[in-house]
Amino acid sequence: MSSLVTQINFNKINNSQSTVKDYILLMKPRVMSLVIFTGFVGMWLAPDSIHPLIAGIAVICIALGAGSAGAMNMWYDRDIDILMKRTQNRPIVRGVIEPDEALSFGLITGFFAVFFMALCVNILASFLLLFTIFYYICIYTIWLKRRSIQNIVIGGVSGALPPVIGHAAVSNTISLESIILFLIIFIWTPPHSWAIALFCNDDYKHCKIPMMPVVKGTLYTKKQILIYSIILFIVSLMPFFIGMNNDIYLIIVCIIGLVFLYYAFSLFYDTPDNKQAKRFFTYSIFYLCFIFILLSSTSTIHSLRDIIFG
């Protein structure tokens, strides 16, 4: 692997080719957008109020924190990114950003995100943001990803924390509501990620990354996806049962949850080419986004109804 990296020399890096777009790509914008969205919903659902300017700063800090983690992840994984089809177009691999520049960018961006969260918002939100960045880089990227079949499960903690950070930015506490938001994302992450691993199995095998399909095989992975999908369906009902949301939420979340289970069962009985894995993966993104939209919208409607009708 190292000889291959040396041979192509990261496409003969040329600093003059670096653009703002390349640095945005370095921050994993698709992942970052989901982090921003779930973090914002965490803020929206917090019972306390926050000044719009402070809220804006908190969202920017969450975004920069996610971006810094993405940049440092690309810095560390550059040797395997170059071997995988779905990551061969990343900025470091293409040679438009040097590895050292990517690391410096990630560290500086992360520092400012944590610093301004502490200065302008509160210490708890800042600490949670720092912990999230640390966990994603040190625990998941460096320690677990290349060593453990449970890399996605344990590493999923970092991806599930943004709504907790957002909630803490407003309330300065970690509440039951924010923990439930955490659990929804935490349980959602393994089946979502294992679906990717199914249709990118050859890439992971080539890079010797111990994803579940590589180590345990396709059938075992599909069983785990199905189990986690059932657990996720149950967890998604919790906001209703603790009074976070109303019966509208319950009805809609049951419908989209049953569709999620349908895709999970379809994947379990899928043909060996795993065509259903891509469909499951696509729907899983829609499912998570829709749940968080539903949480914020039904909560708002419920609050307005209470204000209008007492």
Swiss-Prot record:
CDD domains: PT_UbiA_Cox10. Its main location: membrane. GO terms for molecular function: protoheme IX farnesyltransferase activity. Pfam families: UbiA. Keywords: Cell inner membrane, Cell membrane, Heme biosynthesis, Membrane, Transferase, Transmembrane, Transmembrane helix. GO terms for biological process: heme O biosynthetic process. The keyword Cell inner membrane applies. The keyword ATP-binding does not apply. Pathway: Porphyrin-containing compound metabolism; heme O biosynthesis; heme O from protoheme: step 1/1. GO terms for cellular component: plasma membrane. The chain crosses the membrane at residues 31-51, 52-72, 102-119, 123-145, 151-171, 179-199, 225-245, 248-268, 281-301. It catalyses: heme b + (2E,6E)-farnesyl diphosphate + H2O = Fe(II)-heme o + diphosphate. Its EC number is 2.5.1.141. PROSITE patterns: UBIA (PS00943). It is found in: Cell inner membrane. It is a multi-pass membrane protein. Converts heme B (protoheme IX) to heme O by substitution of the vinyl group on carbon 2 of heme B porphyrin ring with a hydroxyethyl farnesyl side group. Belongs to the UbiA prenyltransferase family. Protoheme IX farnesyltransferase subfamily. Carbon 2 of the heme B porphyrin ring is defined according to the Fischer nomenclature. NCBIfam families: cyoE_ctaB, PRK04375.1-2. This is Protoheme IX farnesyltransferase. It comes from Rickettsia prowazekii (strain Madrid E).
